Amino acid sequence: MTTWFPGHMKTTLKRLRDSVSKNDVIVEVRDARIPLSSRNPALETLAANRKRVVVYNKCDLAFPSAGDLCKTRALNSVRAFEETYVETLARWETIQTLRRYVGTVSNVPECIKRLLQLLQKLTYSDHAASNRTVKVFVVGMPNVGKSSVMNALRHASLHRRKVAVVGSHPGVTRNVGEVVRLFEGKNVYMVDTPGIMLPTILQPEDAIKFALVHAMKDGRLHNAVVVDYLLYRLNLIDPNTYTRLSSPTNDVSTFLHNAAVHTGKLGKGGTVNDDLIASYVLQLYRTGFFGAFVLDSMEEEQWQQRLALEKNLVRRNQRRVCSTRKKA
């Protein structure tokens, strides 16, 4: 199954493969709501034999308790590469850093401080050894918050305003971005990159998850279909999570009608525009209206199945590349 993979993503991936040296650091940002689905085998290959930090962003929308977060940390330790570090961020922590001038280190959220310290550790040794330039490439799928993380780090480190464009829609960054200094007096720079999707969906449910968390542009899937999946997940968790919009139901048409009534969004003659109200419900989900929960299964068996699918995809791509070279 194909996914949203416009030309600039393919170009970006090729440029990254040509640009990232063994001394550089990869910061991969993932959406904590889909910690498994937002893994990208193409980025895994890019990070092989390089220092890498995996940042789970938007944790406030995913984890109601610290226990769930610890479980993600533990599962993430099943890495195929030598140096992988895990950090977690919430939306409010990056926003908090950007909204005020960080005059002292005590004003910086703890997670940002930890991430800065980790990047210092990973970059300073190589820099000191040869005074070479070290780049920190910030990568990940669309709309996981790469630019926000990058801006928060730079603002906390150098007390400067944001340098990367931030948007609420996937695909805001379309080219390998401007190289900006990360630490004062050091040749350590961050590079913003466009979000890169998988050219092929590994599991059918992934496409709906991507649409739900806005990793894909709205309209790629019908909004009502995405809300139908959301309703299914909410019913599994607790139907009381949406009682402000509707009484408990398994029928998405009934849910959308009730939501339109409760929010005053009925059209003329009491009609319901399913697409319009579905779009509104999706916006509510993306702001945490229904609470914090993870869309991916957190069971280790599911992680192992995912890793197997990723390996098969990588092998197919490698065979395709070899076949193309032989024909050339």
Swiss-Prot record:
UniProt record similarity statement: Belongs to the TRAFAC class YlqF/YawG GTPase family. MTG1 subfamily.
GO MF assignments: GTP binding; GTPase activity
Protein purpose: Mitochondrial GTPase involved in assembly of the large ribosomal subunit. Plays a role in expression of the mitochondrial translational machinery.
Entry's transmembrane regions: none
Protein name: Mitochondrial GTPase 1
Membrane disposition: Peripheral membrane protein
InterPro entries on file: G_CP_dom, GTP-bd, GTP-bd_ortho_bundle_sf, GTPase_MTG1, P-loop_NTPase
Binding positions for GTP per the UniProt entry: 57-60, 143-148, 195
Gene3D superfamilies, per database record: 1.10.1580.10, P-loop containing nucleotide triphosphate hydrolases (3.40.50.300)
Annotated compartments: Mitochondrion inner membrane
GO biological process: mitochondrial translation
GO cellular component, one term: mitochondrion
Every CP-type G domain range: 10-199
Keyword list, A-Z: GTP-binding, Membrane, Mitochondrion, Mitochondrion inner membrane, Nucleotide-binding, Transit peptide
